[in-house]
Amino acid sequence: TKSTTLARHLAEGGHRSFCAATPREIEGLVAAGLVDDLLLANETLDTARLGALSERANITVAVDSRATIEAAASGGVRSVLIDVNVGLPRCGCEPAEAPALAELARSSGLEVRGVMGYEGHLMMVTDRAERAQRTAEAMALLTHAADEVGGDVVSGGGTGTFDVNTSCTEIQAGSYALLDTDYDTLDLPSPRRC
């Protein structure tokens, strides 16, 4: 969530869980008093920042390696999601590595809430049937990892795939509140179409 004003508005409507891409965005949410359920969806090695955030908010952090697990544990984080590469190789462990990382996280004193993955490479696939099929393939990697890792959370998706993602327990659709006009090419359910 890049706008604390918008996040506060959503909270007034009953929304309690927020996802952010950077520690700075999480800091903004915390400063705005939105501390119930925050997800830092990108890995960080900044233990000092993690420590400060963990003291002030209920934060879950994405981890995808020994180094990010060690940083989370050293920073006082209590909960993590194992970030799994589902086809966009910018972060996330390989699906086969997820169970071992979950065990490492647990042995480091962290609660493994589940898994997350980001199919960002599919967000702007304009053909809905193709987007649905490719999203299902990406999410099959994630749900298989979830079966191996355990936990209650399967987090993923995005604004461009929320309408075809049937596998996740939570969707990370960050642009949904404003729905940039770029998404009009996808024929997504939108207030502009009502």
Label every PLM stretch briefly.
Residues 1-124:
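Active-site-proximal beta-alpha core segment in soluble small-molecule metabolic enzymes
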Residues 77-79, 85-191:
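Active-site loop/helix belt of alpha/beta enzymes
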